[in-house]
Design a protein with these regions (language model features):
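N-terminal carbohydrate-binding accessory modules
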Residues: 1-48, 78, 84-86
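Aromatic-lined substrate-binding rim segments of carbohydrate-active enzymes
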Residues: 34-109
């Protein structure tokens, strides 16, 4: 496993490392588009992809989890690794203004 350190700059396995990241949200693309989209990101010189985990989509009803098709983040993460990219996962419960209620599921209000 690679060793990542933060000193005066980032280091990966003892060498200075710059994170060049672009955001590609797996849940906004059909899985058939993931590979080409990630390929294009890498072709532009990026080495990292960033994505949210939208709780409201993965658990729309309390206790009912969804992780198939466009929501199959495990398959997306494996593809990112297969393509030689690094991944920044943002499993935050709040996704700014991009989703109603910040991406939190509405059932939390009950």
């Amino acid at each position: 496993m690679a060793k990542f350190e933060i000193k005066e700059e980032f280091y990966l396995d003892g060498k200075p490392f710059k994170i060049l990241s672009g955001a590609i949200q797996y849940f906004r693309l059909h899985p058939d588009q993931w590979r080409d989209t990630l390929y294009n990101l890498k072709a532009l010189g990026f080495n990292t992809v960033e994505t949210y985990i939208p709780w409201a989509l993965h658990e729309p009803q309390e206790g009912q989890f969804q992780a198939e098709g466009m929501l199959d983040f495990e398959a997306y993460f494996k593809l990112v690794e297969e393509m030689g990219l690094y991944l920044i996962v943002r499993p935050t419960p709040y996704i700014c203004a991009e989703f109603d209620f910040g991406g939190l599921p509405a059932w939390l209000l009950r």
